[in-house]
Regions:
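Residue patterns forming the tRNA-binding/recognition surfaces of aminoacyl-tRNA synthetases
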Residues: 1-61, 84, 154-210
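Short, flexible, solvent-exposed loop/turn segments with mixed acidic/basic and small polar residues
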Residues: 1-3, 66-68, 142-148, 188-191
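A secondary-structure boundary/capping signal
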Residues: 13, 64, 82, 142-143
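Alpha-helix boundary/capping residues
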Residues: 25-28, 78, 92-93, 105
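A short catalytic or substrate-binding loop motif that flags glycine-/basic-rich loops and adjacent residues
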Residues: 42-46, 55, 68-70, 119-124, ...
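Conserved phosphate/anionic-ligand binding catalytic regions in large, soluble enzymes, centered on
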Residues: 60-83
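Catalytic alpha/beta core of large soluble enzyme barrels
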Residues: 83-188, 199
Length: 210
């Protein structure tokens, strides 16, 4: 049987060569999900870290985003199956379904998980996070499209502006709040993210989305 194990390994100073690596990555004829995995591994990103408190808990979930201006479009958080504090943030009533899901996806490699972008899977943690600005309850989900080895192992779901988040929200009947003025997101997310104004975003309403 095949199993995953933690082993010691060398870490190269990739960030020193990030510009060259990212530039040359565009010349490689690889599937886009694998390229995206490499971009994440190279690690050059400009953005901010946001912290969501877990409801009725001392735990917090930190996410990194390159688009903090979409914060009011967040309708769920997704953590990786191998998220470090997973058992602490999950509701005990959902433990069986969570453990079954983790067992199911544990046999897949990271490459397989990124390659299967059209196959959405996940399980509800039974817990909620608190939106840092609106105070709204945000459901916390577990899905194998998030990798524990990249970033914080958690991402904020903005279905209005990300197609992957849009498809995930559609499959699991999650809210899809529209934050883009005069943009129809009934069939797909607005992935261009340029040239329009923000709506339904409290103090960000009216700002240009560039």
């Amino acid at each position: 049987p095949v199993s995953k194990k933690r082993v010691k390994h060398w870490c190269l100073r990739i960030s020193k060569y990030s510009d060259r690596l990212l530039e040359d990555l565009n010349k490689i004829d690889w599937p886009e999900p694998l390229k995206e995995m490499q971009r994440n591994w190279i690690g050059k990103s400009k953005g901010v870290s946001l912290t969501f408190e877990v409801e009725n808990s001392k735990n917090k979930i930190e996410v990194f985003t390159t688009r903090p201006d979409t914060i009011f479009g967040v309708s769920f958080l997704t953590v990786a199956p191998e998220y470090s504090d997973l058992h602490e943030i999950c509701n005990a009533d959902n433990r069986v379904s969570i453990e079954n899901y983790i067992k199911k996806v544990s046999i897949k490699s990271e490459r397989d998980r990124l390659a299967d972008v059209k196959i959405m899977s996940g399980v509800f943690s039974g817990s909620y996070a608190i939106h840092p600005f609106s105070g709204k309850k945000i459901p916390i989900w577990i899905s194998d499209y998030v990798l524990g080895s990249y970033g914080t192992g958690a991402v904020m779901g903005v279905p209005a502006g990300d197609q992957r988040d849009f498809e995930f929200a559609k499959k699991f009947n999650l809210e899809i709040p529209n934050i883009f003025d005069k943009i129809n997101i009934t069939e797909s997310a607005f992935s261009d993210k340029t040239g329009f104004k923000l709506i339904n975003s409290e103090f960000l309403d009216g700002y240009d989305f560039n």
